């Protein structure tokens, strides 16, 4: 194996390891978000369907797009700060940017099956 081939192989290995690490960070972020609850609803923000998007870049900076169940939620700042803190506490995360959006509008179809059962909204 030439030195060029060796460096190329190592580069590919490092890229695969980095991709795997980012996937682990994403899984850990979801676990962290499952510890953040809307103060008015006994379901976490992830299973409630309030998290629309999670992106982790190669610098381990996180972007989250989320919403709330209602635009006039009196606890909006609190919930967003709790999400930011939970994400930034995940090992490997450098920083988190939380973008609160109102489009598309949240509805119960975004909830996980567990959340629907917890709130008695399942159709069984």
Would you name each region that the model predicts?
Residues 1-124:
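Domain-level signature for proteins that mediate thiol-based redox and metal-cofactor handling
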């Amino acid at each position: 194996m030439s030195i060029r081939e060796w460096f190329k192989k190592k580069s590919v290995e490092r890229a695969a390891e980095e991709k795997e690490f980012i996937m682990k960070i994403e899984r850990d972020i979801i676990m962290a978000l499952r510890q953040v609850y809307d103060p008015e609803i006994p379901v976490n923000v992830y299973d409630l369907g309030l998290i629309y998007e999670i992106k982790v870049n190669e610098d381990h900076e996180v972007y989250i797009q989320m919403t709330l169940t209602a635009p006039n939620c009196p606890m909006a700042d609190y919930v967003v700060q709790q999400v930011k803190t939970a994400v930034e506490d995940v090992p490997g995360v450098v920083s988190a940017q939380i973008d609160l959006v109102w489009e598309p509008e949240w509805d119960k179809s975004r909830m996980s099956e567990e959340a629907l059962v917890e709130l008695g909204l399942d159709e069984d």
